A protein has these predicted regions:
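PRPP-associated nucleotide enzymes
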Residues: 1-129, 134-256
Length: 256
């Protein structure tokens, strides 16, 4: 019998098939030359939105269980993530979790305000749902919005990929968020898990991380990365296996 995939493994293949995770020669906004790139703007179909919500829900459920009252999606990329995650939490785990998001500009007519969706209450346990984090900027912008709405307990930040890179100092953005705001960040996968899983593995007949690419990625992390090498998938509850997450080598979109 074939071994079931973890949702982490599924998510890595999902990113590759969706054209979100690519390999080659790229330059980051900070000017770093990187051998891989993650472009979450390439998610664009209903199927992808549905699957993405399931991966976020799996990560959230594994790390926080049912200890969340509301999901907050920072405008703009966080909005569909929070909505799709809340749907998946209900469909997969029976958790009917509230969701809300902010407007970039306050509305001065109708109901007004900067918040849309669930009205946060004092004591609510909130998880922020975001695509990636490369600096603490997004969190710094979120905190006044959330704390201005109610006296909430921000339990976690859930993101798709932890690049495990240093920022301007010696810490990663995730480490800085924990240190400055006391907020735990949970990635669906880390870049080291991506390397471990994809190295020498064919996805639809193509090997994306061969020995040369692995060496380039490890050299990049040696220069800009944080934390130890390694990162095998499947350690602890965050890598649990289960039929709920099986893709069975499904393509990007289901056939009709």
């Amino acid at each position: 019998m074939l071994e079931e995939m973890t949702y982490k493994e599924e998510f890595i293949e999902f990113m590759v098939r969706s054209g979100v995770l690519t390999f080659g020669d790229f330059t980051t906004k900070s000017g770093r030359k990187t051998p891989y790139f993650i472009n979450t703007g390439n998610y664009k179909t209903g199927y992808q939105a549905s699957k993405l919500g399931q991966f976020y829900a799996a990560c959230l459920h594994d790390n926080l269980g049912d200890q969340v009252d509301a999901l907050f999606g920072p405008a703009y990329k966080g909005i569909p993530l929070a909505v799709s995650c809340s749907i998946a939490l209900y469909e997969q785990y029976g958790q009917d979790v509230n969701y809300c998001f902010n407007r970039k500009e306050a509305k001065d007519h109708g109901e007004g305000g900067t918040m849309v969706g669930y009205k946060l209450q004092d004591g609510d346990r909130v998880a922020i749902i975001e695509d990636v984090i490369t600096a603490g900027t997004a969190i710094r912008e979120c905190l006044p919005v959330l704390q201005g709405a109610a006296k909430v307990d921000i339990r976690a930040l859930v993101i798709s990929v932890d690049r495990m890179e240093k920022g301007t100092g010696d810490k990663s953005a995730i480490q800085e968020v924990k240190e400055q705001y006391g907020i735990d960040a949970y990635p669906i996968v880390t870049v080291r898990e991506i390397i471990s899983y994809l190295h020498g593995r064919e996805i639809d007949g193509k090997v994306y991380i061969d020995d040369e690419m692995k060496a380039r990625m490890e050299a990049y992390l040696e220069e800009y990365g944080i934390g130890p090498a390694g990162g095998r998938i499947g350690v602890g509850c965050a890598g649990r296996r289960g039929p709920l997450f099986l893709l069975s080598h499904r393509k990007e979109r289901p056939s009709h």
